[in-house]
């Protein structure tokens, strides 16, 4: 059905139809030329203004758009390519390839607006998703089909952890990943693509980008584009998929811009009144079903470090685990720079992970906490003033700190050390030995940047020689 553009206000476009009213979320296509260049713009219906007038949000820049242009309602929401052919490619919000690679014919396309799995389809089992990263698996394990918040400032290693997870899912779980770049820097998107190419994980991941310079419609809907691709892998191929959203805050931010442009009355701190329901709609689709699972890792930017800001606060309600990266740990040269005392997980429960895992994780945290409490005394009076018992705690804590570091596969290029994947059993056994004092006689440095405890012993032997 054809309509006519009647008003253009930046990313908001009004379209008049004759004897037809497109549904909410239906896609409308406009083809026009600007200075001889053919352009195609996709609009999405956001509001009905009358019996045959709709207000839409543009999915790309509306430069050159003018009143009186013809617009065609496509009769369905935006649909994007799905299936194995999307791996190794970069897409925009409407499912067009933007990596300047070979054009591709995609047989299957799915709508980006989908219902979450029904109660009957959802899996209720609490299972751990093994990542092969010691600090994560031991202290803040991820739930299969769960949601993880990744917190950290600039340059502490968020991207490296994301790439390592993609690598481990690809090579150890034989699974696929989807990365949605939501309102982040174009340079970061480019770097990520090139780094993935270099580290050999690109053909196991689909990338969808809606960057900072794009209109709010594209930045908001790009999360749904990526999620739709992940849902296909889960529902049709029965796989366990990893879904990365960087950054989930920008999803709320772009929703707030759209809401203001559509003339809705703002809510707390200027956010959209529908913030919680929009977030819920997205997060409810990320879950385990009886066929497969989508486990998501979402980078969370906290504006002005205010955790009570409505955007991050709304995200917290959905998270099963948090992985907090700490600059002071990165400064010690310990990577991944995960904060062992501030990272949390609802999976760290004796009924889920078992009594032994729980005890050792809590034991490790207790030793690290005691060390933290003693640091002021050490700084003022020195180690010699501590009791023998406290000295032992400090020695073990330093070994634990070092042993929480590990060489990554994707960082081989700049560390020169081969990457390590450590199974949960080996991780538990290693830390159990440290807590029980089995390795009290080994030098601290033997624990730094190694995989399993056997490597610590081998390294200690080498150091003796």
Curated annotation (Swiss-Prot):
Provide the gene name from the record: atpD
Task: Tell me which UniProt keywords the record has, alphabetically.
Answer: ATP synthesis, ATP-binding, Cell inner membrane, Cell membrane, CF(1), Hydrogen ion transport, Ion transport, Membrane, Nucleotide-binding, Translocase, Transport
Q: Which GO terms describe its cellular component?
A: plasma membrane; proton-transporting ATP synthase complex
Q: What is this protein called?
A: ATP synthase subunit beta
InterPro entries recorded for this chain? Answer: AAA+_ATPase, ATP-synt_VA_C, ATP_synth_F1_bsu, ATPase_a/bsu_AS, ATPase_alpha/beta_chains, ATPase_F1/V1/A1_a/bsu_N, ATPase_F1/V1/A1_a/bsu_N_sf, ATPase_F1/V1/A1_a/bsu_nucl-bd
Gene Ontology terms for molecular function: ATP binding; ATP hydrolysis activity; proton-transporting ATP synthase activity, rotational mechanism
Q: Which PROSITE patterns match?
A: ATPASE_ALPHA_BETA (PS00152)
**Enzyme Commission number, as recorded:** 7.1.2.2
Family per record: Belongs to the ATPase alpha/beta chains family.
Where along this sequence does the record place binding of ATP? 152-159
List, alphabetically, the Gene3D superfamilies matched: 2.40.10.170, Bovine Mitochondrial F1-atpase, Atp Synthase Beta Chain, Chain D, domain 3 (1.10.1140.10), P-loop containing nucleotide triphosphate hydrolases (3.40.50.300)
Enzyme class, first EC level, given as a word: translocase
Q: How does it sit in the membrane?
A: Peripheral membrane protein
Q: Reaction catalysed? A: ATP + H2O + 4 H(+)(in) = ADP + phosphate + 5 H(+)(out)
The record's subunit annotation is:
F-type ATPases have 2 components, CF(1) - the catalytic core - and CF(0) - the membrane proton channel. CF(1) has five subunits: alpha(3), beta(3), gamma(1), delta(1), epsilon(1). CF(0) has three main subunits: a(1), b(2) and c(9-12). The alpha and beta chains form an alternating ring which encloses part of the gamma chain. CF(1) is attached to CF(0) by a central stalk formed by the gamma and epsilon chains, while a peripheral stalk is formed by the delta and b chains.
Q: Which organism is it from?
A: Campylobacter hominis (strain ATCC BAA-381 / DSM 21671 / CCUG 45161 / LMG 19568 / NCTC 13146 / CH001A)
A Pfam family that this protein carries is ATP-synt_ab_N
Q: Any idea what job this protein has? A: Produces ATP from ADP in the presence of a proton gradient across the membrane. The catalytic sites are hosted primarily by the beta subunits.
Report the locations given in the UniProt record.
Cell inner membrane
List the SUPFAM superfamilies.
C-terminal domain of alpha and beta subunits of F1 ATP synthase, N-terminal domain of alpha and beta subunits of F1 ATP synthase, P-loop containing nucleoside triphosphate hydrolases
Do you know which SMART domains this protein is assigned to? AAA (SM00382)
């Amino acid at each position: 059905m054809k309509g006519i553009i009647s008003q253009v206000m930046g990313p908001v476009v009004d379209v008049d139809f004759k004897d037809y009213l497109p549904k909410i979320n239906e896609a409308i296509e406009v083809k026009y030329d600007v200075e001889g260049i053919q352009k195609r713009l996709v609009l999405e219906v956001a509001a009905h203004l009358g019996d045959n007038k709709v207000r839409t949000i543009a999915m790309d820049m509306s430069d050159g758009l003018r009143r009186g242009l013809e617009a065609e309602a496509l009769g369905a929401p935006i649909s994007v390519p799905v299936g194995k052919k999307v791996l190794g490619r970069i897409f925009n919000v409407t499912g067009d390839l933007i990596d300047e690679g070979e054009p591709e014919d995609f047989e299957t396309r799915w709508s980006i607006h989908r219902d979450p799995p029904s109660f009957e389809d959802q899996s209720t089992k609490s299972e751990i998703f093994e990542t092969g990263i010691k600090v994560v698996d031991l202290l803040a394990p991820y739930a299969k089909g769960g949601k993880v918040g990744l917190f950290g400032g600039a340059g502490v290693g968020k991207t490296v952890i994301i790439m390592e997870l993609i690598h481990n899912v690809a090579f150890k779980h034989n699974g696929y990943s989807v990365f949605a770049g939501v309102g982040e820097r174009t340079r970061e998107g480019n770097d990520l693509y090139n780094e993935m190419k270099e580290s050999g994980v690109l053909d196991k991941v689909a990338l969808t980008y809606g960057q900072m310079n794009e209109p709010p419609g594209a930045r908001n809907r790009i999360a749904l584009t990526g999620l739709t691709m992940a849902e296909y892998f889960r529902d049709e191929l029965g796989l366990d998929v990893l879904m990365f959203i960087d950054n989930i805050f920008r999803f709320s931010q772009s929703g707030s811009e759209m809401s203001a442009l559509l003339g809705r009355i703002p809510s707390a701190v200027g956010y959209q009144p529908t913030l919680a329901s929009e977030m819920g709609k997205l997060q409810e689709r990320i879950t385990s079903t009886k066929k497969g699972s989508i486990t998501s890792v979402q980078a969370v930017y906290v504006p002005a470090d205010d955790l009570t800001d409505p955007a991050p606060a709304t995200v917290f309600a959905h998270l099963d685990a948090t992985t907090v990266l700490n600059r002071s740990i990165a400064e010690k040269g310990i990577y991944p720079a995960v904060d062992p005392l501030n990272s949390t997980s609802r999976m760290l429960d004796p009924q889920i992970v078992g009594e032994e895992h729980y005890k050792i994780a809590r034991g490790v945290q207790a030793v690290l906490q005691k060390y933290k409490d003693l640091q002021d005394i050490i700084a003022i009076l020195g180690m010699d003033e501590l009791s023998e018992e406290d000295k032992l705690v400090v020695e073990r804590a330093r070994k634990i700190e070092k042993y929480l570091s590990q060489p990554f596969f994707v960082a081989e290029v700049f560390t020169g050390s081969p990457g390590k994947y450590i199974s949960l059993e080996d991780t538990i056994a290693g830390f159990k030995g440290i807590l029980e004092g089995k390795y009290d006689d080994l030098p601290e440095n033997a624990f730094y940047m190694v995989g399993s405890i056997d490597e610590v012993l081998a390294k200690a032997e080498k150091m003796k020689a």
